[in-house]
Amino acid sequence: MSRSLYNWLYRDTLSSRGRTALLFGGVVILVAAVVGGTWYYFHAKAVEKEEQARRAALVLQQKRTSIHNFYTTALKGADVRGFLALYTEILRSRQPIELAGFREDSFSCTTESCSFSYLAGQNTVFSVQDKYFRNVSYAPSFSQESVDYTGIPSGMSSNPVLEAFNRQEKISEPTCNDILNYVYSYNSLVEAGQRFTLTTLPASSVSADEEALPGNPDNHGLLAGKWQVSLPDNYVTVHAFWHNRPYSSSFIFQSVAGKQGILDISGTLLCKK
């Protein structure tokens, strides 16, 4: 009887202790889960915030890069002085080859390089000779009837506006209304063969980016269009056309090509909004 009572009491005690242990263990697990969940929540929030900041910084950097690339592309080229210096060298360098009996068929220059093609005359004794351009000699490639020179540096990749941009200095250009009024007025007064053609009106692909980054040093609020003009291939006409041209700093020269006595000149037109 006493042993049965003892066993019953002992069993009850063990059951109570077990329940206490289970309850304690459950509390510990619950607390751990709450703490772990809380840590995970705030850690996840911190990671998400860092990712948002990283993405925002990346977007801003992409905007800065877009602005920089827009201006370096639009501003790359020569100013009037640089273009006239290049054209003078083109005229000078063609003379020795023409004296040897070759006729310049065509040439073209970009902001990077120039190429020239010469045809042999009917009574020309075919001989290969180098082309001297800015006191540097360039060997040709040739066929039975022509002599070609390629890869000659044009020296037409820089100008004062681009240099000011690279120094992060202020760039002052006329308003688009002023320069467009000038171009249209000029075109109305001259023959069709000497008119400016605006192949692309001034615009900007980065205006919104500049507004989003008001303190960006590359911001200048400029618009860029494309112009083209055709002129006779002779120094007097070309020099007279560009000498003392109003708004000359707004004309960036990026290409010149000559064929059959005509020059096609083109580039970027700069102006303020």
PLM regions and their residue ranges:
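N-terminal cleavable signal peptides for secretion/export
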Residues: 70-89
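N-terminal positive-inside, membrane-proximal cytosolic segments immediately preceding the first
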Residues: 1-32, 37
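Short extracytoplasmic/periplasmic juxtamembrane "stem" segments immediately C-terminal to an N-terminal membrane anchor
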Residues: 49-69
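Generic signature of intrinsically disordered, low-complexity segments enriched in small/polar residues
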Residues: 9, 43-44, 73, 121
